[in-house]
Every structure is written in structure tokens, then in C-alpha cells.
Amino acid sequence: MNTVREPSKTVLIVEKQANYTQLLVKQVMFAGLRPLVAVTGEGGLRKALEFHPNLVLLELDLTDMNGLEFIALMKEHPRLQKIPIIAMSIFSYLKNGALYGGCEDFLKKPVKMIELMTHIRRYLRQRLKYKSPDREP
């Protein structure tokens, strides 16, 4: 009998750009992880509360709130404060604010997928396979 194993770890992707979200979802799934997607900060907070992901990938430039506000709300909430957050942005000047605000890491976009998987592996403490299903952005 064949059984399909469910992914054991969940990654919440909070990203407003659909094409970048698709790329991140592919990489997360390829690594055997379960992706959750939100396109707004408010949606991301709702999903974080509902599903309690193991990690959050956060675009800092959101449509409904500043990514730094999202970080603060996550870190203030007792159920969410220990969830690691990897912030991403095309603006490298946001790095210090993100790290000071409580992010575990910051990646400058466009992110190389092998670099992203290295960072995800670090925070999930799980050995992940990496073989790009697509070309790097």
C-alpha cells in the first residue's frame, strides 16, 4: 500500500507579488515543506494565528501595513513571538530595522533560491534537499 507523507513543517509566505510567491511556493514544496500564502500583512497574521507555521518568509513592502509593523505584531503576540521570520526586500537599507525588530534574518531580493533554502534549513533545523525545479530568478 502506498502512503503519501504530509509535509511536517509549514512555511508562511507573506508576499504581494504573485510571480515571486509562485517561485517561493515551488521551492518550499520541493523541499518537502508545506507552504501557506498571504498577500497582505493582515492575512499573514490571520494565517499565522490559525496554522502556527514553523517559519515566516516576509516581504517587507506590503500593501496594507509596513513589514516592520507585521514583525512587531508577531513578536508581541504570545502565540506567535517565537516563530522565526526571514525578511526579504529589494531595499537593503531595511535590513537593520528588520533585524532590530526581531527578524532572525534578512535577504536582499532577488534572492537566490539555494541561499533561501540554506536560511530556511538553518531556522527549521531540518536537512532539506535542494535541487532547483526552475532556473534562478
Describe the predicted segments one by one.
Residues 69, 90-108, 115-118, 122, ...:
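Alpha4 helix (beta4-alpha4-beta5 surface) of REC/receiver domains from two-component response regulators
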Residues 37, 62-65:
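Residue-level signal for the "D+5" position in two-component response regulator receiver
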Residues 1-16, 114-137:
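Non-catalytic signal-transmission and effector/linker regions of two-component phosphorelay proteins
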Residues 86-88:
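Hydrophobic/aromatic residues positioned on beta-strands within the core alpha/beta folds
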Residues 51-62:
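Active-site beta3 strand of CheY-like receiver
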Residues 63, 81, 109:
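The feature encodes the CheY-like receiver
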Residues 18-36:
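Two-component/phosphorelay signaling modules centered on CheY-like receiver
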Residues 40-43, 66-69:
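Acidic catalytic/metal-coordinating carboxylates
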